[in-house]
């Protein structure tokens, strides 16, 4: 990477402008810039331009905008019958914004297929700060003994939610977290869940890949709009089975049937 002519962001100036996401490199694909810091001002500026940080310990902060972009329309989440059986069988409790740091820390744990993690302690500190400011949110899945077994976190901006990472300690726990997130986003009027990188796992649940230029157009549109006033309020309740049934009734996906 040392031979790449890459824009460098001044770490002392959080207002230092990002290059356009349209100018991202072809190799490494989607790399926009390096350097800077993880201050709230810079992070929110990045997300507003369709750019996010992704790097490993020991590297400079690297900023990305991949093409194509992974997205999921909240009302198009596919509830497969196996996931529906899990919902009916498991006595799990789902909350949001009750354990943001614990969710991030769990997401940072090494996976069986990877030795390291991109969720560094600096990242945890930065996103916890955004959570305190009301910009970052989490969904938590708890087992019947009160153990945290799954979750997801991300950034909210207008009617767009940027999903960052999720984890699972029990089969389907992360899928349940993503389902509840999608359902709440849909009810609250959000139009798009940005999953950043396309994947077969997310495509199985209704995700898709769209060209970056299309994503940036949606980004500009939806970040200028506002979700429902009760979005992310702790007293908001949602019957997930009623939501799933309503989506099946609208023809969103035949596998969503509650029967």
PLM features per residue range, with description:
Residues 1-259:
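N-acyltransferase acceptor-side catalytic subdomain
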């Amino acid at each position: 990477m040392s031979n790449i002519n890459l824009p460098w962001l001044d770490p002392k100036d959080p207002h230092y402008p990002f290059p356009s996401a349209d100018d991202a490199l072809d190799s490494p694909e989607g790399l926009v810039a390096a350097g800077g810091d993880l201050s709230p001002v810079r992070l929110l500026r990045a997300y507003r331009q369709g750019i996010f940080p992704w790097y490993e310990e020991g590297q400079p902060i690297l900023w990305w905008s991949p093409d194509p972009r992974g997205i999921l329309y909240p009302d198009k989440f596919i509830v497969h019958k196996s996931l529906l059986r899990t919902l009916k069988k498991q006595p799990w409790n789902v909350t949001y914004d009750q354990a943001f740091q614990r969710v991030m820390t769990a997401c940072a744990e090494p996976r069986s297929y990877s030795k390291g993690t991109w969720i560094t302690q600096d990242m945890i500190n930065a996103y916890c700060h955004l959570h305190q400011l009301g910009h970052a949110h989490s969904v938590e899945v708890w087992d019947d003994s009160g153990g945290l077994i799954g979750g997801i976190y991300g950034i909210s901006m207008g009617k767009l939610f940027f999903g960052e990472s999720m984890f699972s300690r029990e089969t389907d726990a992360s899928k349940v977290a993503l389902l509840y997130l999608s359902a709440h986003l849909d009810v609250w009027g959000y139009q798009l869940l940005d999953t950043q990188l396309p994947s077969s796992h997310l495509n199985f649940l209704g995700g898709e890949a769209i060209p970056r230029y299309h994503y940036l157009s949606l980004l500009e549109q939806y970040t200028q709009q506002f979700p429902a006033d009760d979005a992310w309020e702790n007293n908001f309740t949602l019957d997930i089975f009623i939501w799933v049934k309503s989506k099946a009734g609208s023809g969103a996906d035949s596998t969503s049937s509650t029967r």
